[in-house]
Regions:
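Short beta-strand-centered interaction patches in the first periplasmic/extracellular domains
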Residues: 79-80, 84-87, 123-193
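Short acidic, glycine/Ser/Thr-rich loop/turn "cap" segments at secondary-structure junctions
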Residues: 89-102, 126-132
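Short solvent-exposed loop/turn micro-motifs enriched in small/polar/acidic residues
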Residues: 44, 62, 150-152, 203
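Amphipathic, non-transmembrane alpha-helical segments in extracytoplasmic/periplasmic proteins
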Residues: 33, 99-119, 135-160, 207
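Short beta-strand/loop turn elements enriched in aromatics
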Residues: 2-28, 112-117, 163-189
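Surface-exposed, non-catalytic interaction/assembly patches
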Residues: 93-102, 169-209
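Noncatalytic linker/hinge segments flanking ATPase motor cores
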Residues: 75-76, 107-114, 122-129, 161-163, ...
Length: 232
């Protein structure tokens, strides 16, 4: 079976030589893409990058990584190496907030306005609960990390999806509890005490449950993935 891959930079497709993508739970992922690009194309290698993959036998491809290029390094006259962070890394900047009688919707709306990010919030009571005040004195990451306690959200987490939208809420209200996965041990390429290596699964992301364990990390390169776990 053939694994199809597609890399877009600012809406333009580039030939992909190799990739190394790492996704994490509650923090932005990182990626390095080596692409076919001449010296004349170098100036265009800025902005948003989107990486999709899918097996040839399946219908369509799945967006696996959406991020921003931090820098592009020349490999030779025909290739560039792109160092990228997941789009949620836009929160890694000073975004002061001071909102009285704030709801989680208010907080996420303020962060969206400051970063251009799009947040997904489940229709649950904690989305509209008002806190006396919400103060964010540091980065957007700090504000999101505090939100779970401030608004009383059990098993709180936030996670960037493949399309760049960011889920914020209880893990129980995310897509994962109703979609547990199982892979027989014989299909693991390699196995350790806290990680497993498997053939690429385009929909696999941190937060998913595989064989009764919650995934905390997914690292993809070539045709395989390494997933790191915690017990559910």
């Amino acid at each position: 079976m053939r694994l199809r891959k597609k890399l877009m930079v600012a809406g333009q497709e580039y030939g992909l030589v190799n990739e190394n993508v790492a996704l994490y739970y509650n923090r932005p992922g990182r990626a390095v893409f080596q692409v076919r690009a001449t010296d004349d194309q170098a100036e265009a290698l800025t902005g948003m990058v989107q990486f999709a993959l899918g097996w040839a036998h399946s219908n369509g491809m799945t967006l696996f990584f959406t991020g921003d290029i931090e820098r592009a390094v020349r490999v030779d006259g025909q290739q560039r190496r792109l160092f990228c962070r997941e789009i949620s890394a836009r929160l890694d900047s000073n975004i002061p907030l001071a909102i009285r009688h704030a709801t989680l919707k208010d907080v996420l709306g303020a962060y969206a306005a400051a970063t251009g990010l799009e947040f997904i919030l489940p229709d649950k009571p904690y989305a509209s609960v008002k806190a006396p005040a919400f103060y964010g004195h540091g980065s957007g990451f700090h504000g999101l990390a505090c939100a779970g306690d401030i608004f009383g959200i059990a098993d709180y987490h936030w996670q960037a999806q493949g399309d760049g939208k960011i889920f914020v809420g209880s893990w129980a209200d995310s897509r994962w509890p109703d979609r547990p996965g199982t892979i027989s041990e014989e299909f693991f390429i390699a196995a350790g005490s806290a990680a497993r290596k498997i053939a690429a699964v385009p929909t696999m992301r941190p937060g998913a449950v595989l064989n009764g364990q919650r995934i905390r990390m997914v690292r993809f390169s070539g045709h395989s993935m390494t997933v790191g776990f915690e017990d559910v």
